[in-house]
Regions:
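Short amphipathic, basic-aromatic surface patches that mediate peripheral association
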Residues: 118-138
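Aromatic (Trp/Tyr/Phe) and Gly/Pro-enriched flexible surface segments
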Residues: 1-115, 130-132, 140-211
Length: 211
């Protein structure tokens, strides 16, 4: 038996069942329930934890061992993530991961910043790449935690094509272990073309189609 957590009201769902938002929060997690060729597997890298008098989400990075007799036997590196939106479960294959989630919620105002409390324990050593196919690889550099807000204007044209225009951007990377909790940290949200903004960094720009 394996526990899989969601940001949701305090309750328990028993059995291999896909989770659907039960209210109380619009946040979803990368924890996932998969059913591939009749085999049920789960992945959990986001856990509940304590913060002050309340609770918080603990995002971890770990190696999940996936094994099913005669079908698959592999290690997959999983990074815990939370996002506004929902997962589309059960996941039935590993193709095009972003098609398995519906990221984003409608917005009608112009927020100035995202505020949150955080604590970071940065891993020592070089990052590892493992997608379950082939051997694990050690990469150069360091891995970072990242928080981003991307506000978009989306529309569908007369031919059914979906378009998205970047409207607002808030993005920051975190790579150093903190001395305890950092409370009320703010990531500003900038609007329009931010490339000439004093605080602009290359990773904040538009994402190329290749990535």
């Amino acid at each position: 038996t394996k526990k899989v957590y969601e940001i949701a009201p305090s309750t328990t769902i028993n059995g291999a069942k896909a989770y659907s938002n039960m209210g109380g929060s619009q946040w979803a997690t990368s924890n996932v329930y998969a059913k591939v060729m009749g085999v049920v597997k789960t992945s959990n890298a986001v856990f509940p934890d304590k913060h002050g008098a309340g609770r918080c989400a603990k995002l971890t990075t770990l190696l999940e061992h996936v094994k099913a007799a005669g079908i698959v036997n592999m290690d997959v590196l999983v990074s815990g993530t939370i996002f506004l939106g929902k997962m589309l479960e059960p996941v039935s294959n590993t193709k095009n991961p972003y098609s398995k989630m519906e990221m984003g919620i409608p917005y009608t105002k112009t927020p100035k910043f995202l505020q949150f409390d955080y604590r970071l324990v940065a891993p020592a050593g070089a990052p590892i790449y493992s997608n379950g196919f082939g051997s694990k690889k050690t990469l150069s550099g360091r891995d970072n935690a990242e928080v981003f807000v991307i506000l978009q204007h989306r529309w569908e044209d007369s031919k059914g094509n979906i378009h998205a225009e970047r409207v607002g951007t808030g993005r920051e990377r975190f790579g150093k272990t903190t001395m305890g909790w950092v409370n009320k940290h703010r990531i500003p949200i900038w609007y329009g073309d931010i490339r000439k903004h004093a605080g602009y960094k290359p990773y904040m720009g538009l994402i190329s189609k290749e990535k």
